[in-house]
């Protein structure tokens, strides 16, 4: 990995790019975008990442507008968008917050008005991707329940 070679040569850390929403549902690639020494935004939901980017640009434009306005994509296939297999982040993030931060069950989350099938799929994704989160580098904690520290789930137990 070129970035890791540069890191070793210069004594600097490689920063990863995964946010809490992506880490929650497994939209992070082991030894790809998860490879690094520090995960700056691993506890920041995707919607807040966009809010922070817009706020930063209000001070002075340093983030290209196309980065903020283009549809989110894992970029693993041509014309792929995250919403091909996920709900929009404006829906996903509140579901994740209820499940991860508030320990609400899928039934309790659905009772708040979310589609029960979407909630079930999202919560399954969270549980199934614990193994990836265990391999993530450390990062800043901004929430009540950060992955790897405050919320750990058994990997091999088969709990639902």
Can you annotate each of these PLM segments?
Residues 1-160:
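ATP/NTP-dependent adenylation/nucleotidyl-transfer catalytic domains that generate, transfer
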């Amino acid at each position: 990995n070129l970035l890791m070679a540069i890191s070793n040569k210069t004594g600097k850390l490689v920063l990863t790019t995964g946010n809490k929403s992506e880490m929650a549902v497994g939209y992070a690639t082991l030894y790809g975008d998860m490879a690094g020494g520090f995960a700056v935004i691993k506890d920041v939901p995707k919607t807040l990442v966009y809010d922070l980017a817009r706020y930063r640009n209000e001070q002075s434009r340093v983030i290209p507008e196309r980065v903020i306005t283009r549809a989110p994509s894992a970029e693993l296939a041509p014309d792929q968008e995250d919403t091909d297999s996920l709900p929009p982040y404006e829906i996903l993030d509140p579901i994740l917050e209820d499940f991860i931060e508030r320990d609400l069950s899928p039934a309790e989350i659905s009772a708040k008005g979310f589609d029960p099938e979407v909630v079930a799929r999202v919560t399954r994704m969270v549980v199934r991707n614990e193994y990836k989160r265990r391999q993530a580098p450390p990062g800043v904690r901004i929430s009540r329940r950060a992955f790897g520290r405050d919320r750990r789930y058994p990997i091999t137990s088969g709990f639902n």
